[in-house]
C-alpha cells in the first residue's frame, strides 16, 4: 500500500511517499500518484520529524527505512551518496571512482538527477570537479542552502 503526505518546510512543500513501511520518495516537485492514500503514517511522520531536526541544525544523519527504486547503477550511486558525511562534499568524478566506474561521470550526474529521496540520500553533496555547484534537480538555490546549512559552503 502506498501512502503520501505533504508538509510545508523551509524549502517549500515536501512530499513524502511510503510503500509498505519504507520511504520511496521525498520530493519538492508536485507529486501525483496513480494510486495511493493521502495520509500521514508513522513512517512519514518520523521522516518529517527528522527532516525538521535537520533543517534546525539538530540532526546530521537520518535513520529511516528506505527502499531505493531504480536501475542497479542508480542504486549503486545512491548507496555511495549515503556514505558522504554531513558537512562534506564529493565531485561527480569521485563518486564514479568510488563505485569502481571512473569514466561514468555523466552517468553519475544522471543518477543524481533521478534520486527519488532528496536530502536523505544526499545528492546535494555532489559538486563539480572545480568545486562549483552544478546540477540539482530542484534548483541550485536549494543546493546552496543545504550546503550552507551543513557548513560545507562558506
PLM regions and their residue ranges:
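Low-complexity, small/basic-enriched stretches
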Residues: 1-62, 131-154
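Short amphipathic alpha-helical boundary/capping segments
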Residues: 64-70
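Short, leucine-enriched amphipathic alpha-helices that occur as contiguous helical runs
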Residues: 70, 74-78, 105
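Short helix/strand-capping hinge loops at secondary-structure junctions
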Residues: 84-87
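Alpha-helical residues within the helix-turn-helix
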Residues: 97
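Short Lys/Arg-enriched helix C-cap and helix-to-coil transition segments
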Residues: 119-126
